[in-house]
């Protein structure tokens, strides 16, 4: 997957189109990413037993995963770009910006 944890991305489709955020977590097997402040849902949490020490129940707002095809990485210039790969002089695979050709 071309998007990793810590990348800054912009949402390119869906209800949150245009929103920017940082990738909190990536799920490569499911092709999804968790983006900070994007695709927020309300989750109903049951009251937990007091001996477990968990927080009380209620409605919690949290981020839900979004498909990787609906986000685009933002390069150093602040513009969205596609991601490509190249090998550096040591033979290591490096991600590059398709728009500028620079390393990400």
UniProtKB/Swiss-Prot annotation:
Part of the 50S ribosomal subunit. InterPro entries: KOW, Rib_uL2_dom2, Ribosomal_uL24, Ribosomal_uL24_CS, Ribosomal_uL24_KOW, Translation_prot_SH3-like_sf. The gene is rplX. One of two assembly initiator proteins, it binds directly to the 5'-end of the 23S rRNA, where it nucleates assembly of the 50S subunit. GO terms for cellular component: ribonucleoprotein complex; ribosome. This is Large ribosomal subunit protein uL24. CDD domains: KOW_RPL26. PROSITE patterns: RIBOSOMAL_L24. Belongs to the universal ribosomal protein uL24 family. NCBIfam families: rplX_bact (TIGR01079). Keywords: Ribonucleoprotein, Ribosomal protein, RNA-binding, rRNA-binding. One of its GO terms (molecular function) is structural constituent of ribosome. It comes from the Bacteria. It comes from Corynebacterium kroppenstedtii (strain DSM 44385 / JCM 11950 / CIP 105744 / CCUG 35717). Pfam families: KOW, ribosomal_L24. One of its GO terms (biological process) is translation.
